[in-house]
């Protein structure tokens, strides 16, 4: 009698399927992807030369000091206070660029790279847009630029266009640790903020 009751329950539960064909239910085992943050339009404040951005037009060079965790904005996940695309750095095409990344975040490793990806920062492949435009071990939480460390990168800008400066530590760009990085064909240079 107990066996008959148990068998009846099994048959009853099996009959209560969701009405989907078995084939569809079996093949649809992946969850829908989580939408990543969509970048805002480039910051449109006045173009300025800041104390951390220096240009030498005769030598066609730019030197920047970019500080990760300069402020506590975004839990220190920012570049000179910029995050979520609220800052645009513009550099002329063909200039030699030196960036000193200073990590002032008290607890977290960060990296810096110039990426051709300008939106949907779910998972950003740590591939630089220009040769040399990336810090070492960019996706490592233990070997990237650690708190209190400074790392220098040097590269020459390529084709004019829209790029981004991102932290390649997994999840950092998706959480907002990115700013716009433009390469200008007309020699325009400087920093714009919406902060």
Locate each region found by the language model.
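Post-signal peptide N-terminal segment of mature Sec-exported envelope proteins
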Residues: 23-47
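Histidine- and aromatic-enriched segments that form or immediately flank copper-ligand environments
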Residues: 76-78, 104-147, 173-176, 180
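Extracellular/periplasmic metallocenter environments
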Residues: 41-46, 51, 136-195
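A eukaryote-biased signal for short, well-structured alpha-helical docking elements
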Residues: 40-71
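Beta-strand cores of secreted/periplasmic/IMS beta-sandwich domains, seen most often
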Residues: 51-55, 85-113, 151-159, 163-165
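Bacterial signal peptide processing site
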Residues: 16-20
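N-terminal edge beta-strand
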Residues: 59-96
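Sec-dependent bacterial lipoprotein signal peptides
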Residues: 1-14
């Amino acid at each position: 009698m107990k066996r008959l009751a148990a068998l009846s329950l099994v048959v009853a539960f099996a009959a209560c399927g969701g009405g989907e064909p078995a084939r569809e239910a079996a093949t649809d085992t992946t969850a829908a992807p989580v939408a990543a943050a969509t970048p805002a339009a480039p910051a449109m404040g006045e173009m300025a030369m800041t104390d951390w951005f220096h240009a030498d037009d005769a030598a066609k060079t730019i030197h920047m000091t970019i500080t990760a965790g300069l402020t506590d904005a975004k839990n220190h996940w920012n570049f000179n206070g910029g995050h979520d695309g609220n800052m645009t750095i513009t550099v002329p095409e063909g200039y030699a660029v030196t960036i000193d990344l200073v990590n002032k975040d008290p607890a977290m490793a960060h990296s810096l790279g110039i990426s051709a990806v300008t939106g949907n920062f779910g998972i950003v492949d740590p591939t630089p847009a220009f040769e040399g435009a990336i810090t070492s071990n960019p996706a490592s939480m233990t070997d990237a630029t650690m708190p209190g460390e400074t790392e220098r990168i040097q590269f020459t800008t390529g084709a004019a266009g829209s790029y981004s400066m991102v932290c390649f530590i997994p999840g950092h760009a998706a959480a907002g640790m990115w700013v716009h990085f433009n390469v200008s064909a007309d020699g325009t240079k400087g920093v714009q903020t919406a902060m």
